[in-house]
Amino acid sequence: MSKVLEQVEAIVTPITDELQLELVDIAFEKEGPNWFLRIFIDKDGGVDIDECAAVSEKVSEKMDENDPITQNYFLEVSSPGAERPLKKEQDFENAVSKYVHVTSYEPIDGRKMWEGTLVSYDGTTLVITITDKTRKITCEIPKDKVAKARLAIQF
């Protein structure tokens, strides 16, 4: 995480903690000529628009006092959605028995992408059951080889 995002996280975390919300992720991205600071929040049962607005107002006030971002940007606060990213240890633990999408930095047994049920996670290894054509395969993926992971919607 960049130094700027770490500073933003230090500003946002007390706000989400106060409102009993989980800070899922922070992204600072350029789209066309515009920059966006995106803050993703959640809680059991999901967040509503009023909670997103409350976080947005409080973060905006704090960022006006001491903003680590020098250029102009748009602030967006939202839910991570149904395909929320898995980043923290707790995210992976909570995703056990759920359908996930995982990519790796390098091929593991000839694959760099898996989509299936996360059977277990022990802190170092993800065990995923995938369907390859008509057969089920169990794959072990070392956590340190995971480039990205998220919940996925199964069709």
From Swiss-Prot:
It is found in: Cytoplasm. One of its GO terms (cellular component) is cytosol. InterPro entries: Ribosome_maturation_RimP, RimP_C, RimP_C_sf, RimP_N, RimP_N_sf. Keywords: Cytoplasm, Ribosome biogenesis. Signal peptide: none annotated. Belongs to the RimP family. This is Ribosome maturation factor RimP.
